[in-house]
Amino acid sequence: MIPSDFIDELLAKTDIVDIIDEQVPLKKGGANYMACCPFHKEKTPSFSVSPTKQFYHCFSCGAHGSAIGFVMEHQGLSFPEAVQFLADRVGMVVPKVHGQNDNPEVRAERKKKQQTLEETTAAAADFYAQQLKFNPAAKAYLDKRGLSAEVIAHYGLGYAPDGWQPLTQVFQPYPNTALVDTGMVIDNEGRHYDRFRHRIMFPIRNPRGQVIGFGGRVLDDSKPKYLNSPDTPLFDKGKNLYGLYEGRAAVKEAGRILVVEGYMDVVALAQFGVGYGVAALGTATTAEHVKILMRQADSIYFCFDGDSAGRKAAWRALENALPQLKDDKSLHFLFLPEEHDPDSYIRAYGKAQFEDALLNQSKPLSEYFWEHLSDGIHLNTQEGKAELVKTSSPLLAQITAPALAYLLKQRLSELVGIDPDNLAQLLGQEAPKRHVKQKNYKLPPISVKQPVMLTLVQRQIRSLLINPDWAAYIDLPDYLALDGDFACLANLAESIKNHAAVPETAQVLEYMRGSPYEETITRIFHSTHQSEEMNSSSEEDCENFQIGMKKLLNELKYSQIETLKQKSLQSGLNESEKKLLLSLLTAKQN
């Protein structure tokens, strides 16, 4: 059995939109993403994916679930296999449950600690955003950079006040363990002080929009120019990209994603209408970054300064990308004039010229690959040709995209003038092919059902699944006899309330997996055919939910009264039952 807190953390680090979009091309449709359902044949898209609730639902066949459920159904995997698949993607290790991992108290404590860390970074982000309003120098700096209030708010920019311990204004006691564990406060041999001081603050968010770390930029020319959060339980700089959450819609619209070097580049580009930029977090572009980028778009562009540092960073990105390359993905590299970075270039020339340079002057990976490797090599000599074969061989061996690998080797053959067959012998054994076990996937025999009218309690169950925080409005007394759908509603509410933080829909669905109520939930989703029914989260909807709970409670009490009356006539009541009946009748009269 895999611990529930691990499942929660896995779902928190997994974006269901990315998972499904790799298999089923999604298109933005209002707040959600839509596609033709992969689980039955249809011409009009009725398959909806919610990025906020992290679950999918088909309004025709009723298919629904979390990212785990989608992987299970679409790839034919078991629950443990699907969990392992998703864990591998985000760099998590599936725990072996034994010893203390079986202890619910240990799991609850670990989950509580995680929640405390998340609350700490969120509170710090709010504090920095508020401080920006009161610091003239910080506001003047952003005004000088031409950033609008809308862009500042979109990226949540803030200001870390000068001084050793400004976070004492919002955190008491100071320091505390969470401040140190999130990297907000430095512990220097017992002396504690804020990591970020007198800097413009850039909150770093995970795919769910939660603040997991920060980048801070100086307002002048002092060093270091950028200061980043260290790796923490929330934040791994090698597996996150700045601006990815904020730019997701722009990436979808443009069909491409752009990697730049600095946070300010990302924000400045967005100010000029290029909102699909992201930046690595104080490190070179890693293999994990490349995997993330390829999940976002088919076309990935890298934009670097034209100086030696920029070119070195570009080559490092290319090297880390080689094992991740796919034949249906393309990488491009743009080098700006040495006097410019993306921020200054787009300010000088505007969006149109910047995007023209990006699309028409950038070099595809295949061109940049040979240009870099042959730089300084005299290909008009035999020695130069031999050197190119030697330096390119280990790099070519890393490429598992079959068509691209073949074409690059063919180009090497042309550059050095060696027959492809002879060149293959020189290169040695070809890079091993990745043998992935393929499963013959067939559309499951799900028939599209006609709408079925749901009862009030079933509608309440659906509303609770969509809005888990509404569990606060459910209070069913212990003396009420609950079975069927009523028991399902009560169990759902109890499962939600038992967690320190309100879970999302995807997590609630996983709580119910394998429970006696899983079939009830499936039946309710199969009977939901209108998108409005899955987006009922307004204040009016919440009021209707509370009214519905009052009706259900009265219905249950009436049923309990009738049951007790019948028993009284047939076999009599014991003392506790008599008191309960009297209490219910009195309450009914009042």
UniProtKB/Swiss-Prot annotation:
Q: How does it assemble?
A: Monomer. Interacts with DnaB.
Q: Which reaction does it catalyse?
A: ssDNA + n NTP = ssDNA/pppN(pN)n-1 hybrid + (n-1) diphosphate
Name by which UniProt lists this protein: DNA primase
GO MF: DNA binding; DNA-directed RNA polymerase activity; zinc ion binding
The protein's required cofactor(s) are namely: Zn(2+); Mg(2+)
- ZnF CHC2-type residues are 37-61
CDD domains for the chain? TOPRIM_DnaG_primases (cd03364)
Role played: RNA polymerase that catalyzes the synthesis of short RNA molecules used as primers for DNA polymerase during DNA replication.
| Native organism | Neisseria meningitidis serogroup B (strain ATCC BAA-335 / MC58)
